Amino acid sequence: MAASVVCRAATAGAQVLLRARRSPALLRTPALRSTATFAQALQFVPETQVSLLDNGLRVASEQSSQPTCTVGVWIDVGSRFETEKNNGAGYFLEHLAFKGTKNRPGSALEKEVESMGAHLNAYSTREHTAYYIKALSKDLPKAVELLGDIVQNCSLEDSQIEKERDVILREMQENDASMRDVVFNYLHATAFQGTPLAQAVEGPSENVRKLSRADLTEYLSTHYKAPRMVLAAAGGVEHQQLLDLAQKHLGGIPWTYAEDAVPTLTPCRFTGSEIRHRDDALPFAHVAIAVEGPGWASPDNVALQVANAIIGHYDCTYGGGVHLSSPLASGAVANKLCQSFQTFSICYAETGLLGAHFVCDRMKIDDMMFVLQGQWMRLCTSATESEVARGKNILRNALVSHLDGTTPVCEDIGRSLLTYGRRIPLAEWESRIAEVDASVVREICSKYIYDQCPAVAGYGPIEQLPDYNRIRSGMFWLRF
């Protein structure tokens, strides 16, 4: 009996293949394909739906079959919108958001979140602020209600402000122990000196000690406006339900400004410069070097991300040794140049930072800087098709793996609508990546890196960090 079943199955399969040979179109149907290309697979990614409330607040969602969801409010405000006087106000408000609202004391807010088994979080950057909740899909109505209450009705009680002031000051002391965070704050301070982007998200400790309830109230009334907000959700959510909940709980957020005092985004200039903080008591030197990169909307971003993928990243705990695909990584292993390095591309509205950060022994700083700049110059002058193909595949993998889960997808939706005005589909990103070849990488790298003045930040035992003029001379090659 079993043999006859197998025989009939084989006969049926042969008949299908025979029909496919006669009609090649059959081979293009998903049922007869064993695999789909990367570009074809991206066509089946769920669509992002976007709607607009009457007050200008945008509502966006991506529905999937997951039993959980992440929903959050992304706001177009960060430390670059602050002044020297109120720098740190946004970070302060982020902390106060969990301490209760006018409708819910802090203990009641915590109990409601815990009773759902949900996770409530928030973060601030130089351009954006976000509040989000990850919960079961059935708890979406309660999650949106809580977010609406947090964004609109923060209690700002004097006792909570004083208590949180001490918490933030302790956090700032802990952050100072993170050498990487310190170096990147130094890098922004020197690269964008004299502009709002130089300001740290946390603000200076003097401001944290002086910020008052009136300062925080003014910050809220100035920046928390509906047209600058996005309610984003991902996972097991229905867009119409989300839209109805947004109208109910966020539809009352104001959209007008007193006396038309609309905040404007101050353009930030890049300055090639350096900042050095020498501390020989520390075991390793942390150094960051960057040139001015493009803003969010620039078409050059994809080619520069491919270039960063070619240079790659490295940590001494990695396996592979000298067989790593990145020439800089294999060289770092062979010559014991560093403990770790990573490339980065930090984008803002109209500018950015494109560079690398490395951690190394005090006697290897000069060598590591020389090799890193040599790799930059090689990309500008002689990037090859094979390494560009490798960089494109690395970027494709990062693009997809970054969106694994409802929280990363929700964050991508919220940030994309604030920066691009829309969510760029993965298929469109793939087409942009596919257009990059070696000539494009050489051209774009030459535009942003070759013979450009860098910003440099060093922290730790950095006596051997080369003089700025030497570093600047490493940004070009004499060619005949």
From Swiss-Prot:
Respond yes or no to whether keyword Nucleotide-binding is given for this record.
no
What are the UniProt keywords, alphabetically? Acetylation, Disease variant, Electron transport, Membrane, Mitochondrion, Mitochondrion inner membrane, Neuropathy, Parkinsonism, Phosphoprotein, Respiratory chain, Transit peptide, Transport
Pfam short name (any one): Peptidase_M16_C
Instruction: State the InterPro entries in the record.
Output: Metalloenz_LuxS/M16 (IPR011249), MPP/UQCRC_Complex (IPR050361), Pept_M16_N (IPR011765), Peptidase_M16_C (IPR007863)
Any single GO molecular-function term of the entry would be: ubiquinol-cytochrome-c reductase activity
Output the GO biological process annotations, alphabetical, semicolon-separated: aerobic respiration; cellular respiration; mitochondrial electron transport, ubiquinol to cytochrome c; oxidative phosphorylation; response to activity; response to alkaloid
**Where on the tree of life does the source sit, at the highest rank?**
Eukaryota
- For the keyword Nucleotide-binding, the answer is no
The Gene Ontology CC terms held by the record are:
mitochondrial inner membrane; mitochondrion; respiratory chain complex; respiratory chain complex III
Modification sites for N6-acetyllysine: 111, 138, 163, 248
Q: Which region of this protein is its transit peptide?
A: 1-34
Primary localization: mitochondrion
List residues modified as N6-succinyllysine: 163
Q: Which family does it belong to?
A: Belongs to the peptidase M16 family. UQCRC1/QCR1 subfamily.
> What name appears for this protein in its UniProt entry?
Cytochrome b-c1 complex subunit 1, mitochondrial
The species is Homo sapiens (Human)
Gene encoding the protein: UQCRC1
